[in-house]
Design a protein with these regions (language model features):
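Mature, Sec-exported extracytoplasmic domains of Gram-positive
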Residues: 25-207
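C-terminal motif of bacterial Sec signal peptides marking the signal peptidase cleavage site
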Residues: 15-18
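Positively charged n-region of N-terminal signal peptides that target proteins for export
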Residues: 1-5
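Small-residue packing motifs within transmembrane alpha-helices
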Residues: 7-9
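Bacterial signal peptide processing site
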Residues: 20-22
């Protein structure tokens, strides 16, 4: 079976209203793709900064701390060096990916053209969502600052949402939560070529 690759291109368009992301099985432009699956909220509410259940938040934070723990030694080895050398930062990031992928979940690097490991789970989640089947998938991102970003995509049969969590290291090399947020995905599309694009709900004027 020919191995596929998934690229993540994060385009945060804060011009007025939109925040968009693109995950693709290749680098093909998603425009004019056939057989797209588009989902738009029928009665969109604000859809951003949604409340997070405390038990769920604890679960997510604990998971992030566990992942940070398994890459701590790699970060300690590169700490300070990667800040001045982009190549070194990418080496660190790639080594982190190799460790994180062992849990079986999809993982990418924070550079725009990083290949996603364990892409099959993301692919299955999206195909199931096309069939309006409930499900979720976790995508980890190894960042060049030595931290991680965790994105949990969920589909309830009607709408898709994403819970994003970011952790970095303190000066004492302890994991620090910088943010956790839950937002609905206003619109998404998954094409036959493996391109996954979505637009998050964000504040709109006059908010």
């Amino acid at each position: 079976m020919k191995r596929k690759s998934i690229l993540l291109v994060l385009c945060i368009g804060m011009i007025l209203t939109s925040c968009e992301s693109k995950i693709s099985l290749n680098s093909t432009d998603v425009k004019n793709e056939k057989n797209q699956k588009n989902t738009t909220m029928e009665n969109p509410d604000k859809g951003y900064n949604l409340p997070i259940d405390e038990d769920k938040k604890k679960e997510v934070v604990n998971d992030c701390e566990e992942i940070m723990g398994i890459v701590r030694d790699i970060y300690s080895e590169y700490n300070g060096i990667q800040e001045a050398d982009q190549n070194t930062a990418e080496q660190m990031m790639n080594r982190m990916k190799e460790i994180i992928k062992q849990n079986g979940n999809p993982v990418i690097g924070s550079d725009h053209y990083s290949v996603m490991d364990n892409y099959q789970k993301m692919e299955q989640f999206l195909k199931s969502a096309e069939q309006e089947e409930k499900g979720s998938v976790i995508l980890y991102e190894a960042d060049t600052d030595g931290g991680i970003t965790r994105k949990e995509y969920s589909y309830d049969g009607k709408e898709m949402s994403v819970m994003s969590t970011k952790m970095i290291w303190s000066e004492d090399t302890e994991p620090v939560l910088t943010y956790i947020s839950l937002s609905k995905i206003k619109e998404w599309a998954y094409t036959e070529n493996g391109n996954f694009c979505y637009e998050l709900c964000v504040p709109e004027p006059p908010e």
